């Protein structure tokens, strides 16, 4: 599936797509 992953950490966040 085509999903969005968001990593949250100290100064902000980073999002990236993942293909499962």
UniProtKB/Swiss-Prot annotation:
Give the highest taxon in the source lineage.
Bacteria
Q: In which pathway does it act?
A: Carbohydrate metabolism; tricarboxylic acid cycle; isocitrate from oxaloacetate: step 1/2
- Keyword Membrane belongs to the record: no
E.C. numbers: 2.3.3.16
Q: Which UniProt keywords apply?
A: Allosteric enzyme, Transferase, Tricarboxylic acid cycle
Q: Biological process GO terms, please?
A: tricarboxylic acid cycle
- Please give the activity regulation comment for this entry: Allosterically inhibited by NADH.
Assembly and interaction partners: Homohexamer.
**What is this protein identified as?**
Citrate synthase
Q: Which gene encodes it?
A: gltA
Family per record: Belongs to the citrate synthase family.
Q: Which reaction does it catalyse?
A: oxaloacetate + acetyl-CoA + H2O = citrate + CoA + H(+)
Q: Does the keyword Acetylation apply?
A: no
Miscellaneous comment as given in the Swiss-Prot or TrEMBL entry:
Citrate synthase is found in nearly all cells capable of oxidative metabolism.
Q: Name one GO molecular function term.
A: citrate synthase activity
